[in-house]
Curated annotation (Swiss-Prot):
Catalytic activity: ATP + H2O + 4 H(+)(in) = ADP + phosphate + 5 H(+)(out)
Subunit structure: F-type ATPases have 2 components, CF(1) - the catalytic core - and CF(0) - the membrane proton channel. CF(1) has five subunits: alpha(3), beta(3), gamma(1), delta(1), epsilon(1). CF(0) has three main subunits: a(1), b(2) and c(9-12). The alpha and beta chains form an alternating ring which encloses part of the gamma chain. CF(1) is attached to CF(0) by a central stalk formed by the gamma and epsilon chains, while a peripheral stalk is formed by the delta and b chains.
Annotated binding of ATP, by residue: G169, D170, R171, K172, T173, G174, K175, T176
Protein name: ATP synthase subunit alpha 2
Gene behind this protein: atpA2
Species in which this protein is naturally found: Rhodopirellula baltica (strain DSM 10527 / NCIMB 13988 / SH1)
Length: 507
């Protein structure tokens, strides 16, 4: 075999000229111990708080505790195949998730991996999971309404775009149902929705996805799921990841609605991680910074100034109470962070009042400014009316004889409570709500039997759609309730009463 020395020399010369003297310098550590979703690593002395690290099995971790001789890392993935003595690489980057239109309609885990069997998310857009919330100067007041389609909420505790409204109550009292109804009502409103399931049973998440698909809501919704079987670090990261995806739309001038279901379980996951990391426990064994864990999350929901595009994130955090104990640590923390709360009461729920919102202690601190003028006009005295009714109802139970005026007030109260009941997954438009509440507060239901109220309302709205469709379109187009429109509502109700056939006479 003959060698061509000139050819070998030219190849060597070309290789030397093309040689790129880049050295990939990475800090490498060693796993000292691992278990329960966390690892203690020796050797990563230059790692930053929140920096990503990579384990030998490909799992990603976050530097959580920076100690003198070791680093506490939370593992965002499979920790069962990580062993003591394995190598850990610092990646020099912060955790980020995919964002943009590609995530809409998908069911993802908190890292953006698909859970719906539709393949990876095809996008080049990513957003950091943790960012500092926008400052006061970069925001504007909440002025646009975000309609939930639920009469009791839109009339008494209205929500505006950019608001944080807490939904709080015991388990199985319809908290998730309120949030899902709010998502369903965003159809055609240009609002992107994010449902973040934290510590929920996989079967419960699957049923929520099924409801969203059946009602066509997955076209504008993303579900981020960290189920009950997911490691605590994933449950902890899930709300931040979902918010990061929503921020893409907010910073591009769009609007997003984020549901955190629920933050009690995120707090429990954070407590578990902190105790395993030997952080000192505080009240109810939660770490001292659990308030900051929730405040830095919820402060990212805002209404941006016009200079930044005027986008918004509206959030509906959910908190589960035990035996109605709203004065516990996590509930009081989140109540103080949010702009109001919807308190759902078990007694109301089991007596058939659904949604089971207690109007006495449910408030919206900033949503009133966002309420439409028509809704504000018809629902102005509704909260006081219902509060007075509850007091009268308690008084009437003593068996005292009531004068006719008090009895009439009590009877109207029963009808208003019945009117504010609403079946699940049947949100109403603002125009329909205005007609319905106007008829109730102005005494047009006083001669309708209490048991008939819901049927009367349903048939009335159908009648208005069929015979007075211009009234619906005028109410939708005009924010204020003029005297002329009010007269048309009264005329439509009176006209409907002539054709309405009650099943039972008025009580």
């Amino acid at each position: 075999m003959k060698f061509n020395s000139d050819e070998i020399a030219s190849v060597l010369q070309a290789e030397i000229e093309q040689f790129d003297n880049k050295i990939d310098v990475r800090e490498v550590g060693t796993v000292l111990e691992v278990g329960d979703g966390i690892a203690r690593v020796y050797g990563l002395s230059g790692v930053m708080a929140g920096e990503m690290v990579e384990f030998a099995n490909g799992s990603i971790g976050l530097a959580f505790n920076l100690e003198e001789n070791s680093v506490g890392v939370i593992i965002l993935g499979d920790y069962l195949t990580i062993e003591e003595g394995q190598e850990v690489k610092a990646l020099g980057t912060l955790l980020s998730v995919p964002a943009g239109d590609a995530v809409i309609g998908r069911v993802l885990d908190p890292l953006g991996n698909p859970l719906d069997g539709k393949g990876p998310v095809q996008t080049d857009i990513t957003r950091p999971v943790e960012i500092i919330a926008t400052g006061v100067a970069e925001r504007k007041p909440v002025t646009e309404p975000l309609q939930t389609g639920i009469k009791a909420i839109d009339s008494m505790t209205p929500i505006g775009r950019g608001q944080r409204e807490l939904i709080i109550g015991d388990r199985k009292t319809g908290k998730t149902a309120i949030a899902i109804d709010a998502i369903l009502n965003q159809k055609g409103q240009g609002v992107k929705c994010f449902y973040i399931a934290i510590g929920q049973k996989d079967s419960a998440v699957a049923s929520v996805v099924d409801v969203l698909e059946r009602h066509g809501a997955m076209e504008y919704t993303t579900v981020i799921a960290a189920g009950a079987s997911a490691p605590a670090p994933l449950q902890y990261v899930a709300p931040y990841a979902g918010t990061a995806m929503a921020e893409h739309f907010m910073f591009n001038g769009g609007h997003a609605l984020v549901v955190y279901d629920d933050l009690s379980k995120q707090a429990t996951a954070y407590r578990q991680m902190s105790l395993l990391m030997r952080r000192p426990p505080g009240r109810e064994a939660y770490p001292g910074d659990v308030f900051y864990c929730h405040s830095r999350l919820l402060e990212r929901s805002s209404k941006l100034s016009d200079e930044l595009g005027g986008g918004s994130i509206t959030s509906l955090p959910i908190i589960e109470t035990l035996e109605g104990e709203v004065s516990a640590y996590i509930p009081t923390n989140v109540i103080s962070i949010t702009d109001g709360q919807i308190y759902v009461q078990p007694d109301l729920f089991f007596s058939g009042v659904r949604p089971a919102m207690n109007p006495g202690i449910s408030v919206s601190r900033v949503g009133g400014a966002a309420q439409t003028k028509a809704m504000k006009k018809v629902s102005g005295g509704l909260r006081l009316q219902l509060a007075a009714f509850r007091a009268l109802e308690a008084f009437a139970q003593l068996g005292t004889d009531l004068d006719p005026a008090t009895q009439a007030e009590l009877d109207r109260g029963y009808r208003m409570v019945e009117l504010l009941k609403q079946p699940q997954y049947q949100p109403l438009s603002v125009a329909e709500q205005v007609i319905s509440i106007y008829a109730g507060t102005n005494g047009h239901l006083d001669d309708v039997a209490v048991k008939e109220v819901q049927r009367f309302e349903k048939e009335l709205l159908q009648y208005v759609h069929d015979k007075h469709s211009s009234l619906i379109s005028d109410l939708t187009a005009t924010p204020a309730l003029s005297d002329e429109i009010a007269e048309r509502i009264v005329a439509a109700v009176k006209e409907f009463k002539t054709v309405y056939k009650p099943a039972t006479p008025a009580a």
